[in-house]
Amino acid sequence: MSYNYTTLIDNYINQSAPIGSTAEGRMSFRGDTLYSYKSKLFQRIAPNTYILDVAISKYSVTTAKHTMRILRAMPSNVTVYRTCIDNDPISNVIDYVSDIKYLISKFTRARSIKPQWQKQINRTYVELQSYIEFYKLDKRTTAYRQFKQLFTIMFEAKCL
């Protein structure tokens, strides 16, 4: 018998129960952390604010399906940061910056799908900006300086 993922996801999002699990533990949650096959997938860090672990979210077809089910079930006022749950915020900012630079390199070489790359770059930049504000990152850090340089790089690549 298969467990109803919808009930588990609703219980996690609404915190209707302290713990929950599907058949054979394919998906479960304990408190603020939701697991896919015992790997941390989502973690609530504040009301209506979650981290989606990008390293785990695409690990398998099933985990990718879990991710999409959860994202579709979340209310529109929820903020989801796509980073690594167990990393410190500065490491995550550096990862975001690296990801955006990679997206910019794809954008500059793209032809027919340039608008999609541009949209992805801008969405990720806004998400990073929100992440930095949420964690009140010290402006003297190297990670923050790298973030500030991104705007210039984006401007020069004409992807703003």
Residue ranges and their predicted role:
Residues 1-160:
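Terminal leader/tail segments of proteins
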